[in-house]
C-alpha cells in the first residue's frame, strides 16, 4: 500500500514538472521575440534620425546658396543704380552741350547781323564818298557856297571816319566772334565725341548688367524651385518621422507595460522559488525552482498560480490518506 502511494506521488510530480517546463519555454520565446522587435524599432528610429539630419544639412546648404544669390542680386542692383546716376549725369552734360550749341547758334546770328551792319556801313561810306564827289563837282560847277559845301564835306568826312572806325570795330568783333565760334564748335565737337563714347560705354555696361541680372534671376528662380522641392520632401519626411515617433512612443508604452508584467511575474516566481522543503505531519513538500527568465503575459502568471494550487491540493490529499 505504501509503495502504491509512493509511485502515485512520483507520477504526480513528473506531470507537474513537465507542465512548468512547457510554460517556461513559451515565455522564453515571447520574451526573445519582444526584444527583437524592440531592437528593430530602435534601428528604424536611428535610421530616420540620420535621414532627417542629412535633409537638414542639405536645406541649410541650399539656404546659404540662396542668400549668396540674393547678395549678388543686391550688388547688381546697386551697380545698376550707379549706372543710372551716371547716365543722368551724362544727360546733364548733354544739356550743357545743347546750351553751348544754342549759344553758338546765337553767336552765328550775331555774326550775321554784324556782317550785315558792316556791309551797310560800307555802303553808307561809299554813298557818302559819292555824295562828296558829287558836291565837289557841284561846287566846281557852281563855284558858290564853297564854305558851306566844305563844311558839309568835313561833316561827311567825319561821318565817314566814324563809319570806318565803326567798320574796324565791327571787323575786330567779327574776327573775335569767328575765333570764338570756331573754338566753341571745336569744344562742342570734342564734347560730343566724348559724350558719345561715354554713352556707348555706359549702354554696354548697362546691357551687361541687365544680362547678368537676368542670369541671377534665373539662378534665383532655380534655387527657389529646388528649395521648394526640398521643403516638400522635408515635410513628407517629417510627417513620416512623426508617424514613426508615434509608433515608437506606442511601442515604448507597450514595452513598459510588458516590462511591468515581466517584473510582476518575476516577483511571483521568486516567491515560489523561496518555498523551502519542510515536513508537515510526516508529509514532505518538494520546493519547485523552474529556470524562468521572463513571462510574456498575464495568462502565464495565472497558469503558474493554478499549478501551485494544484500541487497544494495533491499534498493535502496525500496527507489525508496517511492519517
Curated annotation (Swiss-Prot):
Residues 1-55, 73-92, 120-143 are annotated as: Disordered. Residues 319-323 are mitochondrial intermembrane. Residues 28-278 form a coiled coil. GO terms for cellular component: extracellular region; mitochondrial outer membrane; mitochondrion; plant-type vacuole. Residues 1-297 are cytoplasmic. Its main location: mitochondrion. It is found in: Mitochondrion outer membrane. The keyword Mitochondrion applies. Keywords: Coiled coil, Membrane, Mitochondrion, Mitochondrion outer membrane, Transmembrane, Transmembrane helix. Involved in morphogenesis and proliferation of mitochondria. Does not act redundantly with PMD1. Is not involved in peroxisomal proliferation. Homodimer. Interacts with PMD1. This is Peroxisomal and mitochondrial division factor 2. The lineage of its organism: Eukaryota, Viridiplantae, Streptophyta, Embryophyta, Tracheophyta.
Amino acid at each position: 500500500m505504501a509503495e502504491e502511494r509512493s509511485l502515485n506521488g512520483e507520477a504526480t510530480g513528473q506531470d507537474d514538472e513537465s507542465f512548468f517546463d512547457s510554460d517556461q519555454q513559451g515565455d522564453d520565446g515571447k520574451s526573445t521575440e519582444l526584444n527583437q522587435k524592440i531592437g528593430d524599432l530602435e534601428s528604424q528610429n536611428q535610421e530616420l534620425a540620420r535621414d532627417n539630419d542629412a535633409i537638414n544639412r542639405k536645406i541649410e546648404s541650399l539656404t546659404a546658396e540662396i542668400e549668396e544669390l540674393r547678395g549678388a542680386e543686391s550688388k547688381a542692383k546697386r551697380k545698376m543704380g550707379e549706372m543710372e546716376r551716371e547716365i543722368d549725369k551724362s544727360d546733364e552734360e548733354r544739356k550743357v552741350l545743347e546750351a553751348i550749341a544754342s549759344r553758338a547758334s546765337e553767336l552765328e546770328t550775331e555774326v550775321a547781323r554784324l556782317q550785315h551792319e558792316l556791309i551797310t556801313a560800307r555802303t553808307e561810306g561809299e554813298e557818302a564818298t559819292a555824295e562828296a564827289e558829287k558836291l565837289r563837282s557841284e561846287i566846281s560847277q557852281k563855284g558858290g557856297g564853297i564854305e558851306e559845301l566844305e563844311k558839309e564835306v568835313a561833316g561827311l568826312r567825319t561821318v565817314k571816319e566814324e563809319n570806318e572806325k565803326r567798320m574796324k570795330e565791327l571787323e575786330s568783333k567779327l574776327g573775335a566772334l569767328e575765333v570764338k565760334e570756331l573754338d566753341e564748335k571745336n569744344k562742342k565737337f570734342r564734347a560730343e565725341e566724348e559724350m558719345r563714347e561715354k554713352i556707348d560705354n555706359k549702354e554696354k555696361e548697362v546691357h551687361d548688367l541687365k544680362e547678368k541680372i537676368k542670369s541671377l534671376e534665373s539662378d534665383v528662380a532655380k534655387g527657389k524651385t529646388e528649395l521648394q522641392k526640398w521643403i516638400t520632401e522635408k515635410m513628407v519626411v517629417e510627417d513620416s518621422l512623426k508617424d514613426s515617433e508615434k509608433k515608437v512612443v506606442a511601442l515604448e508604452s507597450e514595452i513598459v507595460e510588458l516590462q511591468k508584467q515581466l517584473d510582476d511575474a518575476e516577483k511571483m516566481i521568486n516567491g515560489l522559488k523561496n518555498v523551502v522543503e519542510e515536513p508537515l505531519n510526516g508529509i514532505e513538500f518538494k520546493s519547485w525552482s523552474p529556470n524562468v527568465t521572463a513571462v510574456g503575459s498575464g495568462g502565464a502568471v495565472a497558469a503558474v498560480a493554478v499549478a501551485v494550487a494544484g500541487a497544494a491540493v495533491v499534498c493535502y490529499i496525500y496527507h489525508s490518506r496517511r492519517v
